[in-house]
Every structure is written in structure tokens, then in C-alpha cells.
Amino acid sequence: MAIVKCKPTSPGRRHVVKVVNPELHKGKPYAPLLEKLSKSGGRNNNGRITTRHIGGGHKQHYRLVDFKRNKDGIPAVVERLEYDPNRSANIALVLYKDGERRYILAPKGLKAGDQIQSGVDAAIKAGNTLPMRNIPVGSTVHNVEMKPGKGGQLARSAGAYVQIVARDGSYVTLRLRSGEMRKVQADCRATLGEVGNAEHMLRVLGKAGASRWRGIRPTVRGTAMNPVDHPHGGGEGRNFGKHPVTPWGVQTKGKKTRSNKRTDKFIVRRRSKK
């Protein structure tokens, strides 16, 4: 893994910082594990914008990543590491002993030729997936399930991890990167180690066009709009003289957005204040 700063041969290259991984596969992805991915432009079935700042971008295929890791007792060999345009983490193509191939999230330190396994009898090493009742307290894990059999939902992006800090009967307590402490059923699965490609956060796109390649459109400030377009719009100069709100008048900056009170009992401690 190398961090490359581009030479300023043009204004668009001047600030570019790339993360280069020579171990990534340079050919095409494994076709049977690809799916068509169509663009929505942020519109719903009525043609109305439901998510702003989305549009354009390079064509992509969706890689079918195995988040469940439920092929127990069958060892697999890592064939290669690949780039995935749909996520910040890299993925690994693994070949199981019975001939099946699957994509998994590539944990830190995983390389071609390594062996991985899932199940209660899997060894305690990076890349193996076990129920959390079988993982030692203090271990660092990723791709953590929140319901048994549903597939990993927590800690899936580049460099992410969760720490198992306690085990109490049928529940384990996890410490998330945000500082939140949360209880999850001990039968939920997790993959040992942390997600690879942690250097992803160090990259610098360098120009607006690089965001457009990724399907991200510009974000216009409300205070730069007219009163008809945004509550912050209009006026002389840059002041808007009121509490910050969204384009629809809902208070922002500090307003609580969590509404799922049913699962509040599983949150032992709220995330840390910044």
C-alpha cells in the first residue's frame, strides 16, 4: 500500500493524493458474482428527487459480497484482492474446497494464498468468521451481525472495526468506533480483524470532476439561494439571521434523528460527543 502525491502538471492534478495497492487484481472481476446496477439520479418511481446531489457517474456493476459468511466447516483459499467501486473497502475473491467462489470483505493483512474458514470451530485469526460467543473478549472484529443469520451490518467500511468488551449470558457488549456501547446477541457472527484499506481516508480527489465520476453532484449552500428555494435564502450579504434548518424547514445541527425506540434498551452508552 503506497500513498502517491501527484505532480502539479495541471490544476486538477496539483492536490491529488492517491492510495495505490499493487496487490489488487488488474483484470476484470469474476462475472458470475456481478449484477447490473442502474442509476436512479436520486429520483423515485414518480420521478421526484428523494436524495439530492446524486447524478451522473461512471457505469458500475454491483459485486455480490457475502456478508453472511455461513458456509461452515469448508476451508477457502484467497485467490485475489479486488477493487470494489461500491464501497471504500477492498474485496477478496475466495475459492472454497467444494469449488464455489464468493466475494468477502478483505480484512487488514489478508493476501492471496491465505486460508480462511467460517463456523464455531474456525481458528481465531483474521478473516475467519465465528459466532461472537466463541470469540475471546477483547478481540477486534468487523462485519458484525445485529440479528443472527441476517448478515453483517456493523463495521464494513475501510479501516472499520468493533471491539468485544464483555460477554454476559446470551449477549455480548460491543464498543463501536463512535464510542457507542451496544449489546448484541452472542449467536450473531463477526469476522476477526479490522477491515483493510484504512488509508482510504488519506486520499484527496483534487478536483470537482473526481466527485462527478463518483456520481456526486454539487451541494449548494442555502444562504446562496433565493428565498423561494431555501429558508436561508435571500437577504443582503451572507447572513440569514435564524436557526439553521433544512430546505424543508426541519431544524438541523443537533436535532435528534433516531426514532427506533424499540432497540434503545440494547444501547448501553451513547456515542461520544465530538
Curated annotation (Swiss-Prot):
GO terms for molecular function: RNA binding; rRNA binding; structural constituent of ribosome; transferase activity. Residues 221-274 are annotated as: Disordered. The keyword Ribonucleoprotein applies. It comes from Yersinia pestis. Belongs to the universal ribosomal protein uL2 family. InterPro entries: NA-bd_OB-fold, Rib_uL2_dom2, Ribosomal_uL2, Ribosomal_uL2_bac/org-type, Ribosomal_uL2_C, Ribosomal_uL2_CS, Ribosomal_uL2_dom3, Ribosomal_uL2_RNA-bd_dom. The keyword ATP-binding does not apply. This is Large ribosomal subunit protein uL2. GO terms for cellular component: cytosolic large ribosomal subunit. One of its GO terms (biological process) is cytoplasmic translation.
